[in-house]
UniProtKB/Swiss-Prot annotation:
Heme binds at residue 463. One of its GO terms (cellular component) is endoplasmic reticulum membrane. The lineage of its organism: Eukaryota, Metazoa, Chordata, Craniata, Vertebrata. The gene is cyp1a1. It is found in: Endoplasmic reticulum membrane; Microsome membrane. Its cofactor is heme. SUPFAM superfamilies: Cytochrome P450 (SSF48264). The keyword Iron applies. It comes from Oryzias latipes. This is Cytochrome P450 1A1. Substrate binds at residue 229. It catalyses: an organic molecule + reduced [NADPH--hemoprotein reductase] + O2 = an alcohol + oxidized [NADPH--hemoprotein reductase] + H2O + H(+). GO terms for molecular function: heme binding; iron ion binding; monooxygenase activity; oxidoreductase activity, acting on paired donors, with incorporation or reduction of molecular oxygen, reduced flavin or flavoprotein as one donor, and incorporation of one atom of oxygen. The keyword Nucleus does not apply. Pfam families: p450 (PF00067).
Length: 521
């Protein structure tokens, strides 16, 4: 799950009693940092002057991705800020980020030892763990293998090319029926409310081998738990950047730990059930696949690393979280853009009608024949930039970038929003225009431009579920456009302003949807 532990602290009155206690420590750490000897030929990182205790916190505001983008115009693609007592290097610019995460990938592949990370999956999270490189690589390899092997399994019949396609197609059909029902009774619906349940059902089917009714209390509870997680993490954890605060009572931190424990217990229960009923000759889902990979074997012949049940729980937890919030947020934005740009929606439907028809569902293999749909998705990722930052990185050794010295164990933020809105890369970046990704005749997507869009990270920490996520967004969206026509609700104007948080969502809204006729809406 793409967590952003940036921003940030709310009212600062809680710090008043700590000033005397922490001043000496702050001064010592600042002096130690700024006086560190810079190797010959390298420069000290530029950046704004920090205040005592809080650093540059006040400069970040409620939309740090915008604040840091403005700072990059002044200080360049590599600069340093101070959040509380922790120095943070901020990377912007397509070439700079690719240099760091790909060409110097080993140097920037770490995760910072933030206080809150130890409570995510009980410290065993694949995405957030600060495990040593050998352990992390082995677990990542296992998770990727299980994810890929199960998602590519044959479907239950020839209609589906793989298990993933079957789960998505069936769930989208349920989604269309649910929307049809609510439109008959209410005349409007909240897209996110229905999409998030459908996406959760797909990942439940993949990970746990079960599907829930849309109104099932266990599923609704999971969705609510995820939304609580997004809300509490979106406000940030001050103790990550001001260590003394971890000794003070915090309602937000208490809720954060509580949410993680509840979800951990849910996944642990399912893993226990799978372990008890595991049959090597009948792999039912990703959880079974993980157990199968780990059963009495080592992950890496050279590393002597074995996988415990606890690590399996952590991986399943990560896969569920990552496949849940990111995809549902992307699809919610997609519906918003369809409503906001009816001419584009009409063009997308015509493309699907012409290339696939209306008598069968789109499939993953149809993606190459629907360039406008593919370009539309890329522009959603770019324009919304609903994942404005990657999970924070950390340097694993003393290194340099663009001539600047960066010490080992430095926290690093990757500003994906800046890259996706950089006028050096994109003409008129503030406008929504899927055509920017199409060839002159509109027959294909320019893959080089598509690869510039930052959403799933890069390099050694790139999201392992990226291919599955892209296919899932495509298939959900293509089927919805084929079956439904979305319109703005009279008297309820659509507000596409992003709300900063774990993932950036637009404001919740109601829209109308109707089953399509052969000629369109």
């Amino acid at each position: 799950m793409a967590l952003m532990v940036l921003p940030f602290i709310g009212p600062l009155s809680v710090l008043e009693g700590l000033i005397a206690l922490t001043t000496v420590c702050v001064v010592y750490l600042l002096l130690k940092h700024f006086n560190k000897e810079i190797p010959g030929g390298l420069r000290q990182l530029p950046g704004p002057t920090p205040l005592p205790i809080i650093g540059n916190l006040l400069k970040l505001g409620s939309k740090p991705y915008l604040s840091l983008t403005e700072m990059s115009k002044r200080f360049g693609d590599v600069f340093q800020i101070q959040i509380g007592m922790r120095p943070v290097v901020v990377l912007s610019g397509n070439e700079t980020v690719r240099q760091a995460l790909i060409k110097q990938g080993d140097d920037f592949s770490g995760r910072p030892d933030l206080y809150s990370f130890q409570f995510i999956n009980d410290g065993k999270s694949l995405a957030f763990s600060t495990d040593q490189a050998g352990v992390w690589r082995a677990r990542r390899k296992l998770a990727y293998s299980a994810l890929r092997s199960f998602s590519s399994l044959e479907g239950s019949n020839a209609e589906y090319s793989c298990m993933l396609e079957e789960h998505i197609c069936k769930e989208t059909e349920h989604l269309v029926k649910e929307i049809e029902k609510v439109m008959k009774t209410e005349g409007k619906f909240d897209p996110y409310r229905y999409i998030v349940v459908s996406v959760a059902n797909v990942i439940c089917g993949m990970c746990f081998g079960r599907r829930y009714d849309h109104h099932d209390q266990e599923l609704v509870g999971l969705v609510n738990l995820s939304e609580d997680f997004v809300q509490v993490t979106g406000s940030g954890n001050p103790a990550d950047f001001i260590p003394a605060l971890r000794y003070l009572p915090s309602k937000a931190m208490k809720k954060f730990v509580e949410i993680n424990n509840r979800f951990q217990s849910f996944v642990q229960k399912i893993v226990n059930e799978h372990s008890a009923t595991y049959d090597k000759d009948n792999i039912r889902d990703i959880t079974d696949s993980l157990i199968d990979h780990c059963e009495d074997r080592k992950l890496d012949e050279n590393s002597n690393i074995q996988m415990s049940d606890e690590k399996v729980v952590g991986i399943v937890n990560d896969l569920f979280g990552a496949g849940f919030d990111t995809i549902s947020t992307a699809l919610s934005w997609a519906v918003g853009y369809l409503v906001a740009y009816p001419d584009i929606e009409k063009g997308l439907f015509e493309e699907i009608k012409e290339n696939i028809g209306l008598n069968r569902n789109p499939t993953i293999s149809d993606r190459s024949n629907l360039p406008l749909t593919d370009a539309f998705i890329l522009e959603i990722f770019r324009h919304s930039s609903f994942l404005p930052f990657t999970i924070p990185h950390c340097t694993t050794r003393d290194t340099s970038l663009n001539g600047y010295y960066i010490p080992k164990d430095t926290c690093v933020f990757i500003n994906q929003w800046q890259i996706n809105h950089d006028p050096k890369l994109w003409q008129d970046p503030s406008s929504f225009n899927p055509d920017r990704f199409l060839s002159e005749d509109g027959s294909e997507v320019n893959r080089l431009d598509g690869e510039k869009v930052m959403v799933f990270g890069l390099g050694k920490r790139r999201c392992i579920g990226e291919v599955i996520a892209r296919n899932e967004v495509f298939l959900f969206l293509a089927i919805m456009i084929q079956k439904l026509c979305f319109e703005e609700m009279p008297g309820e104007p659509l507000d596409m302003t992003p709300e900063y948080g774990l993932t950036m969502k637009h404001k919740r809204c109601n829209v109308r949807a109707s089953l399509r006729l052969k000629d369109g809406c």
